[in-house]
Amino acid sequence: MKYAAIFAAFAMCFPVCMAQGIVDPAAVSVESKVETAINELCDIQVKIVELLESAKDKESADAAAEELFMVIGRVQELQPDVQQIRSCDAATQQRLVKKLLQATIAVGARKKAVGKSLVEHQFYGSEDLKDAVRAML
């Protein structure tokens, strides 16, 4: 209940702050765009590990590779938005970089284990999966 009151107060004050020039709308939209891109990159890291873990034979490895190439394409699409982090204030930059780093660390052990397994199984004979993994490096 108290969060609803805080949110309502913020929602009422925000347009006033923008009108008085206290908050730059361009800065807010850039920060929002960067944060959205960073959040998506965090989700993508988990998705990559899940796709790699789904490879159990050649057929599933080929299917995972196809999806991985789409994910890689999405990461490339997000790059311009992520690069705008430079225009955010230092505190925002630090917060967003920390968030991305924590997401990377959180999936790091799983990614290493699944990578080792894929190498041991020679990518289940899937050249597509091998190419997708190379493209991510």
How should each PLM-predicted stretch be described?
Residues 1-4:
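Positively charged n-region of N-terminal signal peptides that target proteins for export
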Residues 71-137:
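Compact alpha-helical subdomains of small soluble proteins
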Residues 20-69, 131-137:
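Immediate post-signal-peptide N-terminus of mature secreted/exported proteins
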Residues 6-15:
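Bacterial N-terminal signal peptides
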